[in-house]
Amino acid sequence: MQRINLYPSPLTPLVNDGTGDITHGDYDVAIDNLEAGTYVFAADIQNSRAQTGINVMLFDSDWSPIFNSTEIGHVKTTFTLKKPDRVRIRAFQVGVTISNVNVERADTYATAAGGGFPAFFTKDTAAY
């Protein structure tokens, strides 16, 4: 199965500069029309100010929290949607930048993340 990043613009970071103004990057991104199922969220989190507290949060369409992280660096989690829904990704505090965002179905992520040769190779047919 082909890997598809469902995040609309993976090379555009989410930034929270504390102004509350969308022109300065204070915004969240919604991924609409996700089917029910299990997904992987992975991203790089930087924080140029406070190094404590929640840096990133994921919400569903009812603003119910799905995930939050206080980590700096590469963050990865899985989450399950019980019904078709929307997921919002928000840089949660001033100074946070979220980049290299990947949101994809867990079944495609798991097979690709293992790396190595495709399953049709064996130890005798692999091109070492």
Question: What are the functions of these language-model segments?
Answer:
Residues 1-18, 81-83, 90-128:
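Extracellular polysaccharide-targeting segments
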Residues 1-3, 71-74:
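Tryptophan-centered short beta-strand motifs
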Residues 10-12, 23-52, 75-83, 101:
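Extra-cytoplasmic beta-strand recognition segments
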Residues 15-27, 66-69:
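Extracellular beta-rich ligand/substrate-recognition surface
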Residues 23-27, 54-62, 90:
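Aromatic-rich beta-strand patches that line glycan-recognition/binding surfaces
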Residues 38-40, 65-68, 78-80, 89-91:
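Surface-exposed, hydrophilic segments of mature proteins
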Residues 44-73:
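Extracellular ligand-binding interfaces
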